[in-house]
Amino acid sequence: LSIQDVAALVQPSVVAITTEQMVSTNTWFGGSYVQSGAGSGVIISQDGYIVTCAHVVSGANNITVQLADGTEYTATVVGQDSTSDVAVLKIEATGLTPAVIGDSDSLAVGETTIAVGNPLGTLSNTVTNGIVSALNREVTVQGNDMNLIQTSASISPGNSGGGLFNGQGELIGIVNAKSGSTTNTGEATNAEGLGFAIPINTAM
């Protein structure tokens, strides 16, 4: 399939996620404020189950899911696991378009990858492409050591929880990190083209 074909095929399966979290402010006046966050998710059943990253929804009071056609739903967290950074959400909807689940164990370095997500929390259904740059890459994400797929598809904040698809349009990974590591002197090394995804076999 062409990248255009894959994009048309998979975009209805990817959702934008917006979260609201009450954050206490430790001031003399007490009080709290609402901190909003954004991420992405992938529909895995036609009746509203959605997989995303645990760090996207962790601590959220309100979670809103927006489908590719703009319809919005309130989502509930069915389960989440911070170690694998996977969470499952549920929305009350039917007739959705679930992603076709691929096999991340059969991936080869150099294969085409297509990432679909909501970068910066405002650019929903953005499609970027690249290749599988490495497999079983040991990466530490928020204190957890993980074995991830490395891809050159452009990944930005807000892409987390979105889908990484292969050239057949099958879901092979859940995007969860990009390189933002610091050197031992504390300088940020924002390398481009270093994105990471949880292998779908691990996530499932």
Q: What residues fall within each predicted segment?
A:
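Serine-dependent protease modules
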Residues: 1-204
